[in-house]
Amino acid sequence: MARMSTNSTTPLSHIRNFSIVAHIDHGKSTLADRLIQTTGGLAEREMSEQVLDNMDIERERGITIKAQTVRLHYQANNGEKYILNLIDTPGHVDFAYEVSRSLSACEGSLLVVDASQGVEAQTLANVYQAIDNNHEIVTVLNKIDLPAAEPDRIKEQIEEVIGIDASEAVLISAKTGLGIPDVLEAIVHKLPAPKSPGGDKAPLKALLVDSWYDAYLGVMVLVRVIDGVLTKGQTVRMMGTDAKYQVERVGVLTPKMVNIDRLGPGEIGFITASIKEVADTRVGDTITEDKRPTAQALPGFKPAQPVVFCGLFPVDAADFEDLRAAMGKLRLNDASFSFEMESSAALGFGFRCGFLGLLHLEIIQERLEREFDLDLIATAPSVVYKMFMTDGTERELHNPADMPDVVKISEIHEPWIRATILTPDDYLGGILKLCQDRRGIQIELTYVGTRAMLTYDLPLNEVVFDFYDRLKSISKGYASFDYTLTDHREGNLVKMSILVNGEPVDALSMMVHRTAAEKRGRDMCEKLKELIPKHMFKIPIQAAIGGNVIARETISALRKDVTAKCYGGDATRKRKLLDKQKAGKKRMRQFGKVEIPQEAFIAALKMGDE
């Protein structure tokens, strides 16, 4: 690890803390790469595509999951030297929590918009978050080297949709490096310097921006110092958890780790302090000195609440302990992921996990499978329902299999979201129908040029299954979607169970709206009929609500031709053999177990993708 001695803290007027806000795939991480390259943060041989996206899965999917940070040294055209702290934030809706914490550590944002595609749904969500944090915003139009780029039209669109002046937008191509020096100048001259109400003599007050686990150093904590100075050897206290630690090292990321002696007001860097658990470092907490604490903590964040739940089970029961260890390791880096043990009659032992959203679920599952070499089955994703019982109590339901007796429930409330969908108007009809089918309530519909912007209220339950995939297929990939949770509303919801050979399969039970139950049940039974192989006896597959069967399919039995050896002769001989076979099958059906293959589970849970 390199060492850099900086005993004097940088004056506030020469520090700029900024983040980059953009929709997925508009070139945010590539721009970060170019800024690092231009300011000499890494030598040429150390550069790789998307330097700040450390996980393989981030590079492959081309998305940023964990917010990353880097400190750049820049000599401006006016001869002054500046320190620029860039926080690269995720763009996807599930990671909005990571975005909100990163934004509160900065004073300004670069709004990156693809000059060929224009404003997308997540651009809006993240820009509004930046504006809520009182950020100064510099607009950057990327990919202007593409033949399809229309910078003038996109500038008008930004002014119309977001309402910020884009006349002086910086035109760049992050891929070729065109216009990068203009971006650096704009950061220095247009974004404000950080403020420190108390200066470096005041008691220490620092914001905990992020924390991650390093195999050698333990938990590393990313901090933004507001007042006072953070030095090696200091005893610090986390005001939220009241935990005390001695600071072992102080440093900055360039993006390599570089040790320094102290962090002053306005600076962003990392500390390590023999912290064992990432859970001890709550993001958004205030760090202060134990001996001379600050009077007031910073306005705190809310801890991330899991929104979507699903069961994860190892395909091979022997992998259970490995799965537990792997989840513990992931939890070290991702405090928004929660899990607890559960068992299922069909799938054995596993975990009930909570996630921020569907992409978060997919990524955790993929990381478990890839980094820890596990084979997993995920049950149908479900949301958190609030149940008001007849005895006046209130309960939360995370797993449909745990639903109490219907007689004891007076009403069930489900979470609703406010969704923003941007789409070319050619696909508007199909998307309106999709939202209508999913019990959506239209709030508004506006046009921006040839694009329509839809605002809908939708039940989250209808979105977690396959809404995103359907939206993409209807719009041939052009529509973009973003949502925020709004409230819980009463719904006419029922628990639908699937029975195979008279036995309920707990992993396939789900909460559905009463109006959609019959269709959902029929589809599920038909799907399972295709996927479960024939057995030696007849297998009924039923969908039921309570004691009422609402759909049924039957898998016919495999039969051996027992009459093959009878040539001509008496018909009673054949009859006797057939009756004997029938009796055997009946007995078999009583005692036979139906094996449901893994593919059948997975396909049944992916219902509605056709």
UniProtKB/Swiss-Prot annotation:
This protein's membrane topology, according to the annotation, is:
Peripheral membrane protein
**Positions bound to GTP:** 25-30, 142-145
Listed under catalytic activity are:
GTP + H2O = GDP + phosphate + H(+)
Record's keyword annotation contains Cell membrane: yes
List GO terms (cellular component aspect). plasma membrane
Q: Name one Pfam family in it.
A: GTP_EFTU
Any one biological process term the GO annotation gives: positive regulation of translation
Compartments where found: Cell inner membrane
InterPro entries (UniProt xref): EF-4 (IPR006297), EFG_III/V (IPR035647), EFG_V-like (IPR000640), EFTu-like_2 (IPR004161), G_TR_CS (IPR031157), LepA_C_sf (IPR038363), LepA_CTD (IPR013842), LepA_IV (IPR035654)
Q: Which Gene3D superfamilies match?
A: 3.30.70.240, Elongation factor 4, C-terminal domain, Elongation Factor G (Translational Gtpase), domain 3, P-loop containing nucleotide triphosphate hydrolases, Translation factors
Instruction: Please provide the record's keywords in A-Z order.
Output: Cell inner membrane, Cell membrane, GTP-binding, Hydrolase, Membrane, Nucleotide-binding, Protein biosynthesis
Keyword GTP-binding part of the UniProt annotation: yes
Which GO terms fall under molecular function for this chain's record? GTP binding; GTPase activity; guanosine tetraphosphate binding; ribosome binding; translation elongation factor activity
Domain tr-type G residues, every copy: 13-195
What are the EC numbers?
3.6.5.n1
Q: Which NCBIfam families match?
A: lepA, small_GTP
Q: What does this protein do?
A: Required for accurate and efficient protein synthesis under certain stress conditions. May act as a fidelity factor of the translation reaction, by catalyzing a one-codon backward translocation of tRNAs on improperly translocated ribosomes. Back-translocation proceeds from a post-translocation (POST) complex to a pre-translocation (PRE) complex, thus giving elongation factor G a second chance to translocate the tRNAs correctly. Binds to ribosomes in a GTP-dependent manner.
Q: Which family does the UniProt entry place this protein in?
A: Belongs to the TRAFAC class translation factor GTPase superfamily. Classic translation factor GTPase family. LepA subfamily.
Q: What is this protein called?
A: Elongation factor 4
